[in-house]
């Protein structure tokens, strides 16, 4: 019995010592945890900007040798840039877009390089969500349109023996026969529109701006008459002594009216997209003219990682622009239409969402 009592006592003593050591270790661990620095929790900053840059370069070439059906050897090249920078925070947004488009064409039948496409388009829109609405925004919209370089219509020179002349002489005759059609800021269109934006989803928006200031700029005197620029005040009412070289017209025409703009972009899938923009402007100060219409369409079909097929169309109707027929006669308002198809290299840079 004595041995059993001694064994039990020894076990109790050892258990007590073990419990004391465990309590001491737990206390030390708790102190260590309290003294340890707290781990930093990284809070991701809100992202308000989304940027993208799309570039496209197309090259075309045709070579004919002893081709019975005839034709021209041609070389063409065009470049397109579409940059977007959009900001959104809460009920406010600010969207910015810049499109640059330029191309040229050389054909063996003409010893000159011709411009095939030329466009500058800048748009900036600010909007603030209207109270107690879901899709309506108060908005201010600014845009600017023009082109980089002078554009000509190249008519065949009426000179005998043109084909037998040396290249420089041919070039000089072609330049003498060309007709100036446009240039940088000739024309240029810019306006500021205040109104309401209807944005039901990410791919569609409709803007109505009943307060729109519009400026048409033609800095080349010889083109002002074709764009119906207003007569300068010093020549108003004069029957004689009025210049006829275009200097009698002002370089700026101001309009005040209403604008309706519709934008839509539909991505059918990751490789196929369609975008369109329609803009109508009616001038309160000149109601005898029809509303100015601009309608642009673009189809992008991505064939491979860096290659795409593109179709673009541009339609313009402006009855203040006088366009002559093929013979250079009967100038009047006409529907302007341009269509192009291109296959080329495409590269897109976009910010991560």
Where are each of the predicted segments found?
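Sec-dependent signal peptide cleavage junction
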Residues: 17-54, 353
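Residues on the lipid-exposed face of transmembrane beta-strands in outer-membrane beta-barrel proteins
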Residues: 53, 57-59, 79-87, 122-128, ...
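Transmembrane beta-strands of outer-membrane beta-barrel pores
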Residues: 57-63, 89-91, 100-106, 142-152, ...
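Surface-exposed strand-loop-strand hairpins of Gram-negative outer-membrane beta-barrel proteins
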Residues: 60-80, 108-112
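Residues that define the transmembrane beta-barrel architecture of outer-membrane proteins
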Residues: 73-79, 116-122, 186-190, 252-258, ...
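Repeated loop/turn-to-beta-strand initiation elements of outer-membrane beta-barrel proteins
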Residues: 92-94, 133-136, 203-206, 271-274, ...
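Outer-membrane pore/translocation modules
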Residues: 115-255
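Outer-membrane beta-barrel "beta-signal"
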Residues: 336-353
């Amino acid at each position: 019995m004595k041995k059993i009592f001694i064994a039990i006592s020894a076990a109790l003593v050892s258990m007590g010592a073990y419990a004391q050591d465990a309590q001491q270790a737990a206390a030390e661990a708790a102190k260590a945890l309290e003294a340890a620095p707290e781990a930093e929790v990284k809070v991701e900053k809100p992202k308000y900007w989304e940027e993208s840059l799309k570039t496209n370069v197309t090259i075309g070439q045709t070579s004919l040798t002893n081709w019975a059906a005839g034709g021209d050897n041609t070389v063409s090249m065009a470049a397109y840039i579409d940059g977007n920078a959009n900001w959104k925070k809460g009920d406010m947004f600010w969207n910015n877009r810049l499109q640059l488009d330029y191309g040229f064409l050389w054909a063996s039948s003409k010893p000159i390089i011709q411009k095939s496409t030329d466009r500058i388009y800048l748009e900036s829109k600010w909007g603030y969500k209207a109270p107690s609405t879901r899709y309506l925004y108060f908005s201010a919209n600014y845009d600017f349109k023009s082109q980089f370089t002078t554009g000509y219509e190249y008519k065949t020179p009426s000179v005998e023996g043109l084909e037998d002349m040396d290249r420089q002489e041919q070039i000089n005759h072609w330049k003498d026969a060309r007709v100036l059609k446009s240039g940088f800021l000739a024309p240029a269109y810019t306006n500021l529109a205040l109104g309401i934006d209807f944005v039901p989803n990410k791919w569609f928006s409709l803007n109505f701006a009943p307060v729109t200031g519009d400026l048409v700029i033609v800095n080349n005197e010889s083109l002002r008459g074709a764009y119906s620029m207003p007569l300068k005040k010093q020549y108003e009412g004069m029957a004689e002594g009025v210049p006829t070289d275009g200097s009698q017209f002002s370089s700026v025409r101001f309009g005040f009216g209403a604008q309706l703009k519709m934008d839509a972009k539909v991505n059918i899938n990751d490789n196929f997209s369609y975008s369109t923009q329609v803009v109508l402007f009616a001038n309160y100060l000149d109601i005898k003219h029809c509303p100015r219409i601009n309608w642009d369409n673009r189809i992008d079909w991505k064939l491979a990682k860096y290659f795409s097929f593109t179709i673009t169309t541009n339609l313009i109707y402006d009855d203040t622009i006088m366009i002559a027929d093929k013979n250079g006669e009967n100038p009047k308002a006409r529907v302007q239409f341009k269509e192009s198809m291109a296959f080329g290299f495409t590269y897109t840079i976009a910010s991560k969402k």
